[in-house]
Amino acid sequence: MTKQVLIINVTRMGDLIQTGPLLSRLRDEWPDVAIDLVVDRSFAPTAALLTGLRQIISCDFTGLLDECRMQSKSLVTLMQGMTAWAAPLRAARYDRIINLTFNRQTGLLASYIGAPDLRGIIAGPDGCPIVQDPWLSYFTDLHRHRRFNRFNLVDLYAMGGSGTGAFSPLSITIPADGRAWADLFLQSQGRTVRQWIAVQAGASDVMKAWRPEYFGQTMARLSRHSGVGFVMIGTAAEADAI
């Protein structure tokens, strides 16, 4: 019988890209595995670039958190809405759930959906978050010992979500229309640029982002080299920083 895995990874665009080797590792573990991915609605286009997914399940988690903060709806109403949204996932009867979004809310979601094998943050018996799996427990303490860490985030995801296996590089699949648009855009900017550098000035949390002036200073230094051009990338929410 085909194994089913649900990955919850809702908050960061970069983390989605770094999920690629985990997808490959899961296919090594179970060649016929069906993998579903839960993401924030704003990151669904990024998730579509990953290979090996059965389906991408999106939700406006950002809007949901805003409603919680502003108390525009009662907690009971919000919980009823989320349980209704998650009902099909609960009915899917996943074999494994891997929660790579390390906060209490997604821990509650993972535990509500349920699976025989839960990894990452889940809700404990008293509702408080606990971390399942030694590799993902290590990840949650990483900020305390960064100087001593020798593991890449990609490897922690792959080891925690699956286990040991063959090396798999980061990779995404660029659709033909996206590649054609990029070629046309870059060609329209002139032929003096020999090396393009993509700059993402935003972050999932403004407190984690560089100040815009630091990006400006870095780009100014890099621009001293001839033939260098810059492309600012990001989401609509990061437009002010750009």
Language-model-detected regions and their locations in the chain:
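Catalytic machinery of carbohydrate-active enzymes
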Residues: 1-242
